[in-house]
Amino acid sequence: MSLFDTINSGGAQLLGVAWPTVWALVRILVVAVVILLCVAYLILWERKLIGWMHVRLGPNRVGPAGLLQPIADVLKLLLKEVIRPTAASRWLYLVAPVMTVVPAFAVWAVIPFQAGAVLANINAGLLYAMAISSIGVYAVILAGWASNSKYAFLGAMRAAAQMVSYEISMGFALVLVLMTAGSLNLSEIVGSQQHGFFAGHGVNFLSWNWLPLLPVFVIYFISGIAETNRHPFDVVEGESEIVAGHMIDYSGMAFALFFLAEYINMIVISALAATLFLGGWDAPFEFLSFIPGIFWLVLKIFALLSVFIWARATFPRYRYDQIMRLGWKVFLPVCVFWVIVVGFWMMSPLNIWK
């Protein structure tokens, strides 16, 4: 019996009918707290890694080796005043930051951490994740419009066009995973990657979707970088032009909520990429299967997040027209072509997804 089953049965005996509600709230709270801690130390890891890439130390003053820097940053932002521009629409201005964070947290309801460990094991998990992720664009537009500033509105328009453009390519990538797995349930998608010739010989990582769907995996991940408005696709908040884009009139914790949503979305994109293309909690080799699955999932997410950071430290910012051209003239045609290729592949005698 697993630890979760032991807690579940013990709680059911103790609280009776109220236990399912209490257990659901406890799991949600634990996941939310862990995500917040991950975001705090992801920001520290980003600053450290970029520092090392620039041949410097990065934050090292607050606490041992700078480990308390995220706590200092949070306290600083908590103590800053939220200044609302006179011309801003009061309620919409305050709703926009919250509206960015809620969908970012909500996606975690369907992401499986290991076999049987998921908040909501629903059959339409992939569709749910895609639909909830799409809500973020409305919050960005709302923030730009409610500020009643032409610079914020320009940033919001850029963000909306960019996010919608790359969502189409990401959608096609998810359609291909659906075609090969035959299910929208994320746990079943992970399970579908645990079979095949290579998995039968103990080399599990060659059975994962990244290999047969390599171009789509690359497109999905790069589109994820664009979707989160991260460098080199950060024309939304180009420092040399409109500074913080749609966030330019925000301060204090309202400003921090936008950054919180951005970093949670980075982790979400990495978690979905690991689940859909990298076998989720599956170990790369059969002889390593004794290690808990959540370790492998976290390791894959960490590796993908490090690629996010590496891209920020390495590539120059794209121009707006280059971003649009890449999305519409490169990624979209490749995705459509790959849908046709995989369709014929699955109907041929060489179908590897049987």
Swiss-Prot record:
One family name in Pfam for this protein: NADHdh
Gene: nuoH
Segments passing through the bilayer: 25-45, 91-111, 126-146, 170-190, 205-225, 253-273, 290-310, 330-350
Protein role: NDH-1 shuttles electrons from NADH, via FMN and iron-sulfur (Fe-S) centers, to quinones in the respiratory chain. The immediate electron acceptor for the enzyme in this species is believed to be ubiquinone. Couples the redox reaction to proton translocation (for every two electrons transferred, four hydrogen ions are translocated across the cytoplasmic membrane), and thus conserves the redox energy in a proton gradient. This subunit may bind ubiquinone.
Main location: membrane
Membrane in keyword set: yes
Subcellular location: Cell inner membrane
Organism ancestry: Bacteria, Pseudomonadati, Pseudomonadota, Betaproteobacteria, Burkholderiales
Name this protein carries in UniProt: NADH-quinone oxidoreductase subunit H
GO-annotated molecular function: NADH dehydrogenase activity; oxidoreductase activity, acting on NAD(P)H, quinone or similar compound as acceptor; quinone binding
